Amino acid sequence: MRTEIATLGEFGLIDRLTEGIKLENQSSKYGVGDDAAVLSYPSEKQVLVTTDLLMEGVHFDMTYVPLKHLGYKSAVVNFSDIYAMNGTPRQITVSLGLSKRFSVEDMDELYSGIRLACQQYNVDIVGGDTTSSLTGLAISITCIGDADKDKVVYRNGAKDTDLICVSGDLGAAYMGLQLLEREKVVLQGDKDVPVSYTHLRAHETCADL
């Protein structure tokens, strides 16, 4: 069964996608449901903010990307930026540009991936927006996090002889992208095809280090 987004309207869709969301972080004072989220961070913390915009046809291809995987990946790429600066992600806002090609059920699937990522990394969804799009799907996520003021890691802080550490399999996600673009099929993130799974559902392993 397909439900057109127009049958719910913008606010009805937002209510459906965010139903049952609970705030887990102490810095999240008020989330979805008002004109703005309310956040409160301790004075000894530095607040970190990052935004990523993903555009259909540029950053992902709906031919082979399941919506749940896309939602998950859209969230964790933002978490990654916060972790990279030695911070902890706390909240996100999610904004979507949707063409008429997408149904309410499609957005349920996309949001299930976003919510799964937030549950795994203890991040609160505190707001967002939806609008119509003439060119497909656009996903913009802003992530807010915190770090101890004297422990923020900047790119320009790298020095000669510093040890560079990486996690995961370098190049695996790119190899997965090449395979998916060649085959042009949805592999459903099959773990029997490791590189395609790595590309479809990126994991932010820094949180586990």
Where are the model-predicted features located?
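Glycine-rich anion-binding loops of enzyme active sites
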Residues: 54, 89-185
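Single conserved hydrophobic/aromatic residue that forms the stacking wall/gate
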Residues: 199-202, 206-209
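Residue-level signal for inorganic ion chemistry
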Residues: 38, 78, 86, 125, ...
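Extreme N-terminal cap/leader segments of soluble proteins
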Residues: 1-66, 94
